[in-house]
């Protein structure tokens, strides 16, 4: 039994608060245990210079964390004058993941900006950002379809992400909080589609190694968790993506 009472294969309580911010075309507050991330999607009628005239759209992301989202205050990156390597990695990860489930030609020459702002962090902020960002993006795209800006939705599949890890005492664990992540011998972030295909795997042994059997167990655990997350996404989106039922 984990310190928070969960079973090894149990997700933290998760909720999606849609339309959390008024102004963006899509907005979601995702809460996973004590981790809370605001995910906003904004539509811009232009694309980066390298895509102009090509008829394709673009999806990109920015990620940040409030100074007191963590136990100790962290200095805002804007005050430092540069984005950290960790932030850059997470931003690119979110953008790559979302582009994997969107037909950019159907989106047309427009950009969807995803802003993920962590307001409280207790592990799994990047995976929560991806899961929430997909919902915000889907809502924004649904509005484009409903208003006739685009004819059909370019979203090709659902998308969610989760963390898994291996603890010396507890074994394989799903959806690690900060304490578990800090103590894990192995931790992984897994991104998958609704049809069960992998988008990205990030795995590291923390002063430890793991076997092929361990890897298979971690992937199976992640798949179970992601299926649950995607089912919850479907429930809250309702008729936004009817073609993906």
UniProtKB/Swiss-Prot annotation:
Function: Phosphorolytic 3'-5' exoribonuclease that plays an important role in tRNA 3'-end maturation. Removes nucleotide residues following the 3'-CCA terminus of tRNAs; can also add nucleotides to the ends of RNA molecules by using nucleoside diphosphates as substrates, but this may not be physiologically important. Probably plays a role in initiation of 16S rRNA degradation (leading to ribosome degradation) during starvation.
GO process terms (BP): rRNA catabolic process; rRNA processing; tRNA processing
InterPro entries per the UniProt record, alphabetical: ExoRNase_PH_dom1, ExoRNase_PH_dom2, ExoRNase_PH_dom2_sf, PNPase/RNase_PH_dom_sf, Ribosomal_Su5_D2-typ_SF, RNase_PH, RNase_PH_bac-type, RNase_PH_CS
HAMAP family named among the record's database cross-references: RNase_PH
CDD domains assigned to the protein according to its UniProt record, in alphabetical order: RNase_PH_bact
E.C. numbers: 2.7.7.56
Top-rank taxon: Bacteria
Subunit structure of this chain's protein: Homohexameric ring arranged as a trimer of dimers.
Name of this chain's protein: Ribonuclease PH
Residues that bind phosphate: 86, 124-126
Gene Ontology molecular-function annotations: 3'-5'-RNA exonuclease activity; tRNA binding; tRNA nucleotidyltransferase activity
Protein source organism: Bacillus velezensis (strain DSM 23117 / BGSC 10A6 / LMG 26770 / FZB42)
Reactions that this protein is recorded to catalyse: tRNA(n+1) + phosphate = tRNA(n) + a ribonucleoside 5'-diphosphate
Short name of any one Pfam family annotated for the protein: RNase_PH_C
Family: Belongs to the RNase PH family.
Enzyme type, top EC level: transferase
Encoding gene (name): rph
UniProt cross-references to SUPFAM superfamilies, sorted A to Z: Ribonuclease PH domain 2-like, Ribosomal protein S5 domain 2-like
Presence of keyword Thylakoid: no
UniProt keyword terms in alphabetical order: Nucleotidyltransferase, RNA-binding, rRNA processing, Transferase, tRNA processing, tRNA-binding
Keyword Transferase: yes
PANTHER family: EXOSOME COMPLEX COMPONENT, EXOSOME COMPLEX COMPONENT RRP41
